[in-house]
């Protein structure tokens, strides 16, 4: 377990905060760490910023993540990792497709040749929108409060997909499943970063299993070819207790 110090806590939206800290560790875009919150347990978090000054961006959706968002400069941050394979970052034009907080793990890929499709339920839940110039971003909201009125996969169909060398996707699994349907069969290189229930992060507990693949060890990044035909992707998710729940994907 590594003990670091929080340098800064920046509020991104009503329930999302970015925590900055110094850590001299090489990390690939798309890798993650297991963050330990004393008294609350561990949760997996992707890195939203690399370099010597690193960051994680946290959405408060449960007691552990909510406690993380409350950390202040000087507070302890406990983690282990980094884990996972990370993205295969290609040269040339790239498109990031982030749903909800999914743009967080994609952001370290961004360079001067990168566009971003960012989607959320409503304007107030958009994250990192202002980190991309208007000419390089596509915005979609479910309620139409900002940008395109609709879902990420619907807006993606209006974009010239073939103009990109690579497309990287992260978000809720239902959203990614629909994006996969739009992208399969295209010649562009595509990778998805999956978000699944994780307890150990090192391939022991098997709670993150996806059709025989361990997301924490073999992922969390998968090429589109690995997900096409996977019997669980977009079909089931597993709760922390191990219960399988069918996803509502139409």
UniProtKB/Swiss-Prot annotation:
Domain FAD-binding FR-type: 1-89
Entry-linked Pfam families: DHODB_Fe-S_bind
Pathway terms, separated by semicolons: Pyrimidine metabolism; UMP biosynthesis via de novo pathway; orotate from (S)-dihydroorotate (NAD(+) route): step 1/1
Residues that, per the record, bind [2Fe-2S] cluster: 200, 205, 208, 216
CDD domains: DHOD_e_trans_like2
Keyword Flavoprotein annotated: yes
Record keywords, A-Z: 2Fe-2S, Electron transport, FAD, Flavoprotein, Iron, Iron-sulfur, Metal-binding, Pyrimidine biosynthesis, Transport
Biological process annotations from GO: 'de novo' UMP biosynthetic process
Co-factor requirement: [2Fe-2S] cluster; FAD
Top-level taxonomic group: Archaea
InterPro entries: Cyt_c3_hydrogenase_gsu, Dihydroorotate_DH_ele_sf, Dihydroorotate_DH_Fe-S-bd, Dihydroorotate_DHASE_ETsu, FAD-bd_FR_type, FNR_nucleotide-bd, PyrK_electron_transfer, Riboflavin_synthase-like_b-brl
Gene3D superfamilies reported for this sequence: Dihydroorotate dehydrogenase, electron transfer subunit (2.10.240.10), Nucleotide-binding domain of ferredoxin-NADP reductase (FNR) module (3.40.50.80), Translation factors (2.40.30.10)
Record text on cofactor binding: Binds 1 [2Fe-2S] cluster per subunit. Binds 1 FAD per subunit.
Listed GO MF terms: 2 iron, 2 sulfur cluster binding; electron transfer activity; flavin adenine dinucleotide binding; metal ion binding; oxidoreductase activity
Family to which the UniProt record says this protein belongs: Belongs to the PyrK family.
Function: Responsible for channeling the electrons from the oxidation of dihydroorotate from the FMN redox center in the PyrD type B subunit to the ultimate electron acceptor NAD(+).
Subunit annotation: Heterotetramer of 2 PyrK and 2 PyrD type B subunits.
Protein name per UniProt: Probable dihydroorotate dehydrogenase B (NAD(+)), electron transfer subunit
Originating organism: Thermoplasma volcanium (strain ATCC 51530 / DSM 4299 / JCM 9571 / NBRC 15438 / GSS1)
Lineage: Archaea, Methanobacteriati, Thermoplasmatota, Thermoplasmata, Thermoplasmatales
Gene that this polypeptide is encoded by: pyrK
């Amino acid at each position: 377990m590594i003990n670091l110090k929080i340098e800064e806590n920046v509020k991104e939206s009503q329930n999302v905060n970015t925590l900055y800290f110094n850590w001299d560790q090489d990390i690939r875009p798309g890798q993650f760490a297991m963050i330990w919150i004393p008294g609350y347990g561990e949760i997996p978090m992707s890195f939203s910023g690399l370099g010597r000054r690193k960051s994680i961006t946290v959405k408060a959706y449960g007691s552990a993540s909510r406690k993380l968002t409350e950390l202040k400069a000087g507070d302890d941050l406990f983690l282990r990792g980094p884990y996972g394979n990370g993205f295969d970052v290609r040269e040339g034009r790239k498109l990031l497709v982030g749903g909800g907080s999914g743009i967080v793990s994609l952001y370290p890929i961004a360079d001067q040749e990168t566009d971003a499709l960012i989607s959320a339920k409503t304007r107030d839940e958009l994250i990192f929108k202002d980190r991309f110039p208007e000419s390089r971003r596509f915005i979609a909201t479910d309620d139409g409060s900002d940008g395109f009125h609709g879902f990420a996969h619907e807006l993606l169909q209006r974009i010239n997909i073939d103009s990109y060398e690579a497309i990287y996707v992260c978000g809720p699994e239902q959203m990614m499943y629909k994006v996969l349907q739009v992208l399969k069969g295209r010649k562009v290189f595509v990778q998805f970063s999956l978000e699944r229930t994780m307890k150990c992060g090192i391939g022991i507990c098997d709670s993150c299993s996806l059709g025989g693949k361990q997301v924490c060890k073999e992922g969390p990044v998968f090429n589109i070819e690995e997900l096409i035909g996977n019997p669980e992707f977009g079909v089931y998710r597993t709760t922390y207790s191990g219960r399988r729940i069918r996803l509502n994907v139409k």
